[in-house]
């Protein structure tokens, strides 16, 4: 869910940062040769994109790393790392228009979650950026259906009364 803080003016030299749990790019599925999440990222005009639950495949009928790199070609710098104890299945990625000088996984006890520390050169400054994959809120399928209904129809009786 986007969180937007609006201002009448954008400060000079501001940086646009996008953090997104892409949830495996929706199973890497393509619709008419495109992935909606990837299109959103491409159109975001962010300077730096931090992604959690990052994934790609070599199967050309699904979303491949090559497709992602082609869509995000204006980001000259990228870093993709495995995180968590079961690290082969969970990746965190950073795509940046600014040089990524270094990256390191921040280790802590978790099966799937993790964090990566990046040092990014922005003009004359070196900025520390933490890309963090937070613990799941453990919503059930039923909870997710209710949540989607709330977003679509916030005035519905079910939402107002908190009924399942």
What are these regions (language model features)?
Residues 17-22, 37-63, 129-132, 158-164:
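Active-site beta-strand/loop signature of hydrolases that rely on acidic residues for catalysis
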Residues 19-34, 55-58, 138-163:
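Acidic/histidine-rich helix-loop elements
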Residues 2-9, 29-30, 48-147:
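Structured beta-strand-rich core segments of catalytic domains in phosphoester-bond hydrolases
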Residues 45, 72, 151-155:
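Generic secondary-structure transition motif, activating predominantly at the C-termini of alpha-helices
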Residues 1-39, 43:
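N-terminal signal-anchor transmembrane helix
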């Amino acid at each position: 869910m986007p969180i937007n803080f609006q201002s009448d003016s954008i400060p000079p030299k501001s940086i646009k940062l996008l953090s997104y749990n892409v949830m495996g790019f929706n199973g890497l599925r393509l619709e008419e040769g495109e992935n909606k999440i990837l299109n959103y990222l491409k159109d975001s005009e962010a300077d730096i994109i931090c992604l959690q639950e990052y994934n790609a495949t070599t199967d050309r009928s699904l979303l491949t790393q090559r497709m992602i790199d082609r869509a995000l070609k204006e980001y000259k710098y990228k870093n993709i790392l495995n995180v968590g104890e079961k690290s082969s299945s969970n990746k965190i990625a950073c795509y940046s228009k600014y040089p990524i000088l270094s990256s390191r996984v921040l280790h802590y006890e978790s099966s799937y979650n993790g964090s990566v520390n990046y040092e990014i050169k922005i003009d004359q400054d070196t900025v520390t950026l933490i890309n963090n994959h937070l613990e799941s809120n453990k919503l059930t399928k039923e909870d997710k259906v209710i949540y989607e209904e709330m977003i679509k129809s916030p005035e519905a009786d079910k939402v107002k009364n908190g009924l399942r």
